[in-house]
Amino acid sequence: MAKLTKDELIEAFKEMTLIELSEFVKEFEEVFDVEAAAPVAAVAAGAPAAGGAAEEEKTEFDVVLTDAGAKKIGVIKAVREIVSGLGLKEAKELVEGAPKAILEGASKDDAEAAKAKLEEAGASVELK
């Protein structure tokens, strides 16, 4: 197998959907026995020393679909509206594979809007 350059890898990642990238990261973590979130956890562990302001400073949120509920079709439609460029098959797999992250690193307003839309469709959602 030919060795890919960093630029070639970046170009390949640009063509992937968020779901494909998420699955890639999970498989990468399993194969190499590493955690991509380890540095973030170390930073978050140091934050409480600054006082109780850590909650106020959080600017990025993950929207996690915990349960699709009884109305899966409505939830699939909502997921497709929230995640641009997502096909019907990918949205269905995402909903059926709950719990799954729908949005990662979203602003507070975007995360709350996505949560409201998913809950309106009948899903159970968490913001992390």
Swiss-Prot record:
HAMAP family: Ribosomal_bL12. GO terms for biological process: translation. The keyword Ribonucleoprotein applies. One of its GO terms (cellular component) is cytosolic large ribosomal subunit. Forms part of the ribosomal stalk which helps the ribosome interact with GTP-bound translation factors. Is thus essential for accurate translation. It comes from the Bacteria. GO terms for molecular function: mRNA binding; structural constituent of ribosome. Homodimer. Part of the ribosomal stalk of the 50S ribosomal subunit. Forms a multimeric L10(L12)X complex, where L10 forms an elongated spine to which 2 to 4 L12 dimers bind in a sequential fashion. Binds GTP-bound translation factors. PANTHER family: 39S RIBOSOMAL PROTEIN L12, LARGE RIBOSOMAL SUBUNIT PROTEIN BL12M. Keywords: Ribonucleoprotein, Ribosomal protein. Transmembrane segments: none annotated. This is Large ribosomal subunit protein bL12. The keyword Flavoprotein does not apply. Belongs to the bacterial ribosomal protein bL12 family.
